[in-house]
A protein has these predicted regions:
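Acidic/His-rich, divalent-metal-binding segments that scaffold phosphate/diphosphate chemistry
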Residues: 1-60
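Metal-centered catalytic cores of metalloenzymes
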Residues: 4-16, 28, 93-96, 166-168, ...
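Predominant activation on well-ordered alpha-helical scaffold segments within soluble catalytic domains
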Residues: 7, 11, 24-27, 31, ...
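Structural signal for hydrophobic packing residues in well-ordered secondary-structure cores
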Residues: 14, 30, 34-37, 76, ...
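Amphipathic alpha-helix face/heptad-repeat signature
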Residues: 22, 102-105, 168
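Divalent metal-dependent catalytic cores for phosphoryl transfer on phosphate-bearing substrates
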Residues: 37-142
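Long, low-complexity, intrinsically disordered polar/charged segments
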Residues: 38-58, 159-180
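C-terminal binding/interaction regions
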Residues: 124-125, 130-179
Length: 181
């Protein structure tokens, strides 16, 4: 499966525009970390792009989230490590590899950064910076859905929180037009 095929699958299965944008943001962050670590950029990108493919089917059935995605992707013969990372992002598999950990920590972070942009008067990623993100990170009422403990597990992939947040922001800024931010 190539990226275009994956993107088409995402657009066919995710009804909400924001979910598609979330998938694009996670993909961008995953690709950025793959480049940094010298890993397969396409594989890492696919894990990010496809990780929530089943969301509309499992929104009221959380125990099957990620598992249904893996089932939906069986016919595409994706590498097992991509499928494992997808399961791992929602606690359905042990986080073993750097890709597993990256997807797990990037998932809430993309939403957190999006919230930072939307709270700025311009609503643009270009006006978000590390200082603003660090301030918002400490505010428990801000972007409640973005699990801070989960985000802080970035250290398990060998990246300190500030560097992690900045790298994700940079990745998302590169596709800001696609994200509408």
């Amino acid at each position: 499966m190539d990226r275009n095929e994956a993107l088409q699958l995402v657009k066919q299965n995710l009804k909400g525009e924001n979910l598609v944008k979330h998938s694009l943001a996670v993909e961008a962050c995953m690709r950025e970390f793959a480049m940094r670590f010298g890993e397969d950029v396409e594989k890492w990108g696919l894990s990010g792009l496809l990780h929530d493919l089943d969301y509309d089917f499992t929104v009221n059935d959380p125990p099957n989230h990620a598992l249904k995605t893996v089932a939906m992707l069986q016919e595409y013969n994706l590498d097992d490590d991509i499928l494992h990372a997808i399961k791992g992002h929602d606690h359905k598999a042990e986080l073993k590899s750097r890709m597993d950990i990256s997807l797990y920590v990037v998932d809430p972070t993309s939403g957190f950064i999006t919230a930072c942009a939307l709270m700025h008067p311009s609503k643009k990623l270009e006006n978000v910076d590390l200082k603003r993100m660090k301030k918002r990170f400490k505010e428990s009422a801000f972007a409640k859905g973005a699990n801070r403990e989960q985000m802080q597990e970035c250290v398990k992939m060998g990246v300190e929180l500030d560097d992690f947040l900045q790298t994700c922001l940079n990745a998302m800024q590169k596709i800001s037009v696609d994200l509408g931010l």
